[in-house]
Amino acid sequence: MLEIKNLTKSYGDVLALDRFSLDLKKGEVLGLLGPNGAGKTTLISILSGTVGGFTGTVNFRGRNLFADREIKNRLGIVPQDMAFYDELSAMDNLLFWGGLYDVPRADLKKRAVELLELVELAARAKEPVKNFSGGMKRRLNTAIRLLHKPDLLLLDEPTVGIDVQAKVSILDIIRGVGAAGTAVIFTTHQLAEVETTCSRVAIMDRGRVLAQGTLDELVRIVGERDVVDFMGDFAAAAFSDAVRELAGERIELLSAADGLASLAVRDTAEVPRIMDRLFQRKIAVTDMKIKSPNLETVFLKLTGRTLRD
């Protein structure tokens, strides 16, 4: 649905995007993850048409996004700055914006009702927006950008500056939009948001995509492995001897001490084979824990720094 190739943008001597490339399919929710200055907001600004002076191509549904007004109207853009009238009700704001989006008048009221239910504001549809909390306003802002049923929704840091409950609501909305078939790109520097919300992840740093895919695919790209900890009544030497013949490309002994040992495995399907060997060697294991690589591990491996650096 969306194909970005070699997108490059500079601000003076600063390279904000460096041959940025990305693909997105219908219904995919892609989290664009990176530290401040990675180029996330620049990308959203280019796609939304507010920043020019770049090179590269962006095709949306097989057509040039910037040369085809009709295709560009299939985007929904949710900026951090919210645009609505505080004195009007939530419903009246939706009706006003629906007119600007050329939503057919016969369909507009029904669409507004559907969206107020989606963002959990139906009970306060007739209330002036000035009475809403920051999180409620953020949800209404998202509803407005969904009025024309876009094929692609762009959100720049949608959970910044709102409380935890409001963040949960926004992320639920994003998941629901993706499940309904709309492709979504949202920028964030919050690992947990990406892990719980996205079907795919793109990790950015210094204007480039370092890797993209599902979390499992990213783990394979960086070569991270699951770590299995074994606890029990055994000697370090006995445990090491027991697993030595299993060690290889798929299994590695990381550490062994009396009563505690750790193995790295390429696939947790190896665990039953390991347990069989330990049982055969009479290694008394009383507990076992599997620690899978997470997004923070992958990010650190790719960038050499944490999001907080």
What residues fall within each predicted segment?
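ABC transporter nucleotide-binding domain
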Residues: 171-265
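Walker A (P-loop) phosphate-binding loop of ABC-type ATPase nucleotide-binding domains
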Residues: 35-39
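Catalytic Walker B motif of ABC-type/P-loop ATPase nucleotide-binding domains
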Residues: 153-157
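Conserved ABC transporter NBD signature motif
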Residues: 56-71
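Conserved ABC ATPase "signature" region
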Residues: 95, 99, 106-124
